[in-house]
Amino acid sequence: MKKPVIAIPIGDPAGVGPEIVAKSIASDEVFQIAVCVIVGDRKIVEKAIEITGENLKINEIKEPDEAVDEKGVLNLIDLDNVDMDTFAYGKVSGMCGKAAYEYIAKSIELANAGQVDAVATTPINKESLHAAEVPYIGHTEIFGALTHTEDPLTMFETNGMRVFFLTRHVSLRQMLDMIKKDRIIDYVKRCTKALERLGVKEGTMAIAGL
């Protein structure tokens, strides 16, 4: 069976995302299930490989169809958008926020064009996004805007339990204004359809109150 092609933006260059990527690509578990296309900055990825000590070879590509399915090979689309002279690990910066956004945007562009089957994200820093004047607060809002999806769903899954969020990234006052009967009914219907797409045909849905 042909493996799906997954785009993975490296997240905030100053954070742990690039190291997570290096460790994931080096793992047998990830290699067995997908062909991964990393979107990031080569200099940052090389540092992540050095820090983690993983035995990885970078295969720099321009398009996902150039990716190779070989153990120990990290397929990379290099956006070359980090200035190492001003870069610092663990620091909030507009440069890193802008870079992180560009990695996500490029990954979504590939998905929208049908060049990859899905996008798997890594950690970003909301303060850095703000410093870069990115007009979105996080992943969900970026995906919603760049896929032209109004009111996108967010779902977490842990130990077989799936959690959807009626509100996110808003103040308590805004949250209270958003919790309306019609919105809840609409959300339950949308969540049910989303679960069906994931293969969940039957189950029990609990709705948490305030």
Locations of the language-model features?
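Mobile beta-alpha loop/short-helix "lid" or hinge segments that flank ligand
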Residues: 156-164, 168, 205
